[in-house]
Amino acid sequence: FGARGDSQLFFDYFMKFFDDELFPYLKEHNIKTIIHAGDMMDRRKFVNFNILHQIRTRFMDELEKNDMHMHCILGNHDVYYRNTNKVNSMQELFGNCKAITIYENPEVINIDGLDIALLPWVNSENYDESVDFIKTASAPVLIGHLELEGYDVIRGVKYDGGMKAKLFERYEQVLTGHFHCRQEN
């Protein structure tokens, strides 16, 4: 949210998808749990109050009204500093929202009998803890906000640096935010 300098046009475009596609699909299939893989907010430093008001009244209230719950891990755009997850927009803006659980640290959750490892933005402060979590978390699925070497950040532009995909081979499925196009490995 807040893309293109808090553009109302972009916000309305996103909300059209949520209103016309996402929420109707969730309701039709009685889906009550959502996992967001980070970067809920576009900019790490600010969002304008008009867009923030609309996020609350048009998105968060819709979650609550329909008894839905969103598990939200932090992405790099959600944190103020690149080297820590401690100061983040999600906690500051939505920390009291009953419809959201925010994950600043790695954690395994269970949804309908499935253990899922959630891994927020990996930075210099939490790198060792994150690598240990990746290696030891007892879950077949990992959802993170990962910088992975050799993957397309956007179509045709490979990311140079980041973690090696080999580190995640023990998982049956790994899903990540951060990258702006769907990719298979």
What are the residue ranges of the model-derived segments?
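N-terminal active-site segment of His-dependent metallophosphoesterases
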Residues: 1-57, 130-139
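His/Asp/Glu-rich metal-coordinating catalytic cores
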Residues: 33, 46-185
